[in-house]
Amino acid sequence: MASGGLRGLAVAGGGESSDSEDDGWEIGYLDRVSQKLKVPLPVEEKNETFKKALTTGDISLVQELLDSGISVDSSFRYGWTPLMYAASIANVELVRVLLDRGANASFDKDKQTILITACSARGSEEQILKCVELLLSRNADPNVACRRLMTPIMYAARDGHPQVVAVLVAHGAEVNTQDENGYTALTWAARQGHKNVVLKLLELGANKMLQTKDGKIPSEIAKRNKHLEIFNFLSLTLNPLEGNLKQLTKEETICKLLTTDSDKEKDHIFSSYTAFGDLEIFLHGLGLEHMTDLLKEKDITLRHLLTMRKDEFTKNGITNKDQQKILSALKELEVEEIKFGELPEVAKLEISGDEFLNFLLKLNKQCGHLITAVQNIITELPVNSHKIVLEWASPRNFTSVCEELVSNVEDLSEEVHKLKDLIQKLQNERENDPTHIPLMEEVSTWNSRILKRTAIAVCGFGFLLFICKLTVQRKYPNICF
């Protein structure tokens, strides 16, 4: 009854696996003689025909079979229902027909819900969104989790569907729910590198500080997976995006986030979310969206903006208020500078030797930190230009700065050699200075030598007197001492 192959078989969404490779579905094109079922089919054959009609998306045959008495919630082998299969391939019309015939939108198989299956389906985001909307309209719960505690919004975020994320939240989905590994929808979006989803979730009140079971926050997850643009954006402390839509009603949220596609389905909606570049993301995160057109008109890149001086800000028409926001954000991102003010004032002549030694040790430690920092940069820097995520200025600028850095390092090396020679000179002069007052250790050593020599001399003199006394007594026994 079937011939030929048809695409690949849909599997359970979000990494959930069924008990069989094909879950009881035979994939193929349905070779039909007639559009009508002229002869009643046996139950077993009718079920096979129903499965093949679902597989090929034959809406009219599905309706005929339903009219013939087959159950809309038929449980095929391994437990999948017709609606679950239709949702897994994002077949909007098939989902609509089955729901209109009374299919259970809240059905689950081993905690794999139909809504989860739809959110992780194969197909365009527009198709997936329409299927999700249909299921939500039939009271499918957006907060029911699978065996791994992942909810529909996590699957939508993981697969990069900001429109689906928005409509789920509009229907009551919890944004900050965590799965068995502590991942939230934001963590999944950051892990997979879905910038648009990250922005949308922040608007919807996602908490970017929630940690996974291994203690990582979304920005760290993004960095670990080489999504540096998302890492930089999530690292910003100032983020007026966060929670912008959190207090709106469901109707207000849908109205703000989604637009109607009147050309295709007037009763279905989908988002018109636009992707941002790195400059737009930076400005958007600071609430400076109004500056976007101004900076683009003047061909100012993000790198240029981050290195502007006060006069350049003013020259390019950036107000003091906006300047302060940019500078505050930069301050948050800067690595703390070396605080040499905490070191002793080495120029003073009364400085102690211990303080000077401590200064040199701290200076050496700071140099070690600088070497490590450069080594880390070399390790993290992409080896191929096509792997660079953020917009870069001309490589000549970086080369020029590196040349200045090399020059400064050479100057530092020269100054340290001068310092070393000066210290060596002072040491030599001190050793040859007759007025030099030795340290307590040296004085005590000299005193001990004198005491030792005196003791030996006294003992020797006493022994000599004893010998002389014995000799005299033998020769002159009448002499008394």
Swiss-Prot record:
Feature: compositional bias, Gly residues: 1-16
Keyword Cytoplasm on entry: yes
Keywords of the record: ANK repeat, Cytoplasm, Developmental protein, Differentiation, Meiosis, Phosphoprotein, Repeat, RNA-mediated gene silencing, Spermatogenesis
Residue positions, PTM Phosphoserine: S17, S18, S20
SUPFAM superfamilies associated with the record: Ankyrin repeat (SSF48403), Pseudo ankyrin repeat-like (SSF140860), SAM/Pointed domain (SSF47769)
Entries under Gene3D superfamilies matching the protein: Ankyrin repeat-containing domain, Transcription Factor, Ets-1
Keyword Iron: no
Record-linked InterPro entries: Ankyrin_rpt, Ankyrin_rpt-contain_sf, Asz1_SAM, SAM, SAM/pointed_sf
Parts of the chain that traverse the membrane: none
Chief location of this protein within or outside the cell: cytoplasm
GO CC field: pi-body
Purpose of the protein: Plays a central role during spermatogenesis by repressing transposable elements and preventing their mobilization, which is essential for the germline integrity. Acts via the piRNA metabolic process, which mediates the repression of transposable elements during meiosis by forming complexes composed of piRNAs and Piwi proteins and governs the methylation and subsequent repression of transposons. Its association with pi-bodies suggests a participation in the primary piRNAs metabolic process.
Name assigned to this protein: Ankyrin repeat, SAM and basic leucine zipper domain-containing protein 1
Organism name: Microcebus murinus
Gene of this entry: ASZ1
